[in-house]
Regions:
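Phosphate/Mg2+-binding loops and adjacent switch elements
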Residues: 1-67, 74
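Short, acidic/turn-prone active-site loops that include or flank metal/cofactor-
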Residues: 28-31, 71-72, 122-128, 169-175
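Short, aromatic/basic amphipathic alpha-helical patches
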Residues: 109-112, 152-162, 183
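Short, conserved loop/helix-junction motifs that constitute active-site signature segments
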Residues: 17-18, 47-51, 88-91, 136-138, ...
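Ser/Thr/Gly-rich flexible loops in soluble cytosolic domains mediating phosphotransfer, phosphorylation
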Residues: 36-54, 58-69, 94, 106, ...
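Redox- and metal-dependent alpha/beta enzyme cores, enriched for Fe-S-associated oxidoreductases
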Residues: 74-80, 87-131, 181-189
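A short, acidic, amphipathic alpha-helical segment used as a generic capping/interface helix at domain edges
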Residues: 126-139, 147-150
Length: 195
């Protein structure tokens, strides 16, 4: 099969990767911070880099036509059957286990769905979990991101006796119609038709 299109997340720093289109998602809630690069700030590229790509504002309240936000779906049980999903109780105590770059966003997501009784357990971005990281003194469930769930699933398969519930909060990127229109226009200019 011939590939017509490759989409790379976090591909801006992969300079060897040839590209024709660059979209830069700018979190309007965080802004540009102190405008310094890692490790002094949280930027991966200088601010000037914004002028080289298409900037998509990430905020539900954005006034830019090129915007997106994350829509939260119902949590699902990572280590159980699908019929157990109805057992999710947002009023119980949770351990929020998270290994992402900006864990506060996950905590805000939990609060946005009415979940406020959670204890934060943060790990570095792209963390490789050990089963000991999921051991706590009581039997309260864990709640985590889909990104972390991808790393936790193989670990759970290695430890089939692990019986603490792990709930996953899925989010879906919702792009404005202007984003889809621009993408169609940019791809058409490259001779790629996705319709």
């Amino acid at each position: 099969h011939q590939l017509d299109l490759i989409i790379s997340d976090d591909g801006l720093q992969h300079w060897a990767l040839a590209r024709q289109i660059e979209w830069i998602v700018l979190d309007q809630n965080r802004g540009l911070g102190n405008q310094k690069l890692l490790p002094e700030g949280f930027l991966r590229e200088p601010v000037e880099r914004l002028s080289e790509g298409t900037v998509i504002e990430h905020a539900q309240s954005s006034t830019s036509p090129l915007n997106m936000y994350l829509e939260v779906a119902k949590p699902y049980l990572l280590n159980g059957s699908s019929d157990q999903a109805e057992l999710f109780d947002m009023h119980q105590d949770f351990y929020a286990v998270v290994g992402i770059g900006f864990p506060q966003r996950f905590y805000q997501t939990l609060e946005s769905i009415g979940l406020t009784r959670f204890q934060c357990h943060e790990f570095p971005d792209h963390y490789d979990y050990e089963i000991e990281d999921l051991q706590f003194e009581d039997s309260n469930p864990i709640i985590t991101t889909e990104k972390d769930a991808v790393k936790l699933l193989p670990l759970l398969k290695q430890h089939p006796d692990f019986n603490r519930e792990i709930w996953v909060v899925p989010v879906e990127a919702v792009l404005s119609q202007a984003c889809y229109d621009l993408l169609d226009e940019q791809l058409t200019a490259l001779g790629i038709n996705i319709s």
